[in-house]
């Protein structure tokens, strides 16, 4: 797909629309104990000239044991107290990635120039 870039991202990283994700903490192979859930994200950015849609789907061995959801942005008006320490991802109010939502039959919007992610 022309104008589409993506990268695997840790489930611990927040994918903000205006900042390329670092990819820190990504493992080549995921492991878990029996009964544990493991997750990762697929961060993507569409650089096309207009909004498009994609219809992601899982394939391969074990696909019936996995699911894919989109990470939606939610408003955050007061991200931190003015007298807080420096260990925050951002100090600005805005739209933050937080809500996991099932993908409808309409697919996922590709918004030009913004990083977004899928949660697997």
Stretch-by-stretch model annotation:
Residues 2-24, 48-119:
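Surface-exposed binding patches on compact interaction domains or structured appendages
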Residues 25-52:
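Contiguous beta-strand segments within globular domains
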